[in-house]
């Protein structure tokens, strides 16, 4: 059970290539794509109808792209600083990602008051942060 998004941990999962590589998704047929998330990678390329080879990687996957072990990577991007440092760039955003509160069904029932109060406090905090952010952008 997922009662609410949390107001932190916002990032995105993206397809990443070496900087300056001018390529379209369609031209990636047969490419070797490295990722810590091979199932998401396979699903993405399958949905767009492009056959690629997916390589499961661990650790700093950006080094595999920089070293030429893979043609591209799929990884989580927050600020993009790591990409810039490693001469990489986002080619395509696959999906937005955020932290979420997850409650198991038994706790939802046995600790309803506590869980409900926690969810309500988080939602209130999100509204306050959103209002503060909106005021900051208007100034």
What are these regions (language model features)?
Residues 1-139:
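Domain-level signature for soluble enzymes in the chorismate/prephenate branch of the shikimate pathway
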């Amino acid at each position: 059970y997922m009662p609410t998004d949390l107001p932190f941990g916002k990032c995105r999962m993206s397809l990443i290539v070496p900087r300056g590589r001018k390529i379209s998704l369609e031209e990636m047929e047969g490419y070797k794509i490295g990722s810590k998330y091979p199932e998401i990678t396979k699903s993405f390329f399958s949905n767009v109808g492009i056959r690629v080879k997916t390589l499961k990687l661990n650790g700093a996957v950006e080094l595999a792209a920089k070293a030429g072990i893979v043609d591209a990577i799929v990884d989580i991007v927050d600020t993009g600083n790591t990409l810039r440092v490693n001469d990489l760039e986002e080619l395509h955003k696959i999906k937005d990602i955020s932290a979420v509160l997850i409650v198991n069904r038994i706790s939802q029932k046995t600790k309803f008051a506590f869980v409900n109060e926690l969810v309500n406090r988080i939602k209130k905090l999100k509204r306050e942060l959103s209002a503060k952010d909106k005021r900051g952008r208007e100034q």
